[in-house]
């Protein structure tokens, strides 16, 4: 992975191992949620794990992504409660990019995850 080529909204395969406990691990898709200034200048990125296990409990921090879109072969869920900082060297293949509408959904789910104003995806 070449530094400086990562953009907010990009989806990459990333190696998230090793993990502890309930963290998402292995080589899996991740969504880059860090701002582009950080993406350009930092050796790390902030990313959210993506799973194809669509039978998981539906949370207001989950965003559904249809298989066949943005480089994902299966229906998947972006897990905005599973956000972590990773070194860019963990990034592998670039898969695709979310559109503006999808990123607005992501931003709302992040607000829910972090308890920020505007997070209104079903949480009280």
Question: Across the structure, where does each feature detected by a protein language model lie?
Answer:
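Conserved functional hotspots at enzyme active or ligand-binding sites that engage polyanionic ligands
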Residues: 1-124
């Amino acid at each position: 992975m070449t530094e400086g080529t990562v953009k907010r909204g990009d989806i990459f395969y990333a190696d998230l191992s090793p993990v502890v406990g309930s963290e998402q691990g292995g080589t899996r898709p991740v969504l880059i949620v860090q701002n582009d200034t950080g993406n350009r200048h930092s050796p790390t990125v902030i990313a959210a794990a993506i799973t194809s296990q669509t039978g998981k409990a539906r949370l207001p921090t989950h965003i559904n992504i249809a298989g066949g879109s943005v480089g994902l072969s299966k229906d998947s869920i972006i897990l905005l409660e599973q956000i972590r900082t990773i070194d860019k060297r963990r990034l592998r293949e670039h898969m695709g990019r979310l559109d503006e509408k999808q990123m607005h959904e992501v931003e709302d789910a992040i607000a829910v995850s972090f308890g920020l104003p505007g997070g209104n995806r079903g949480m009280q």
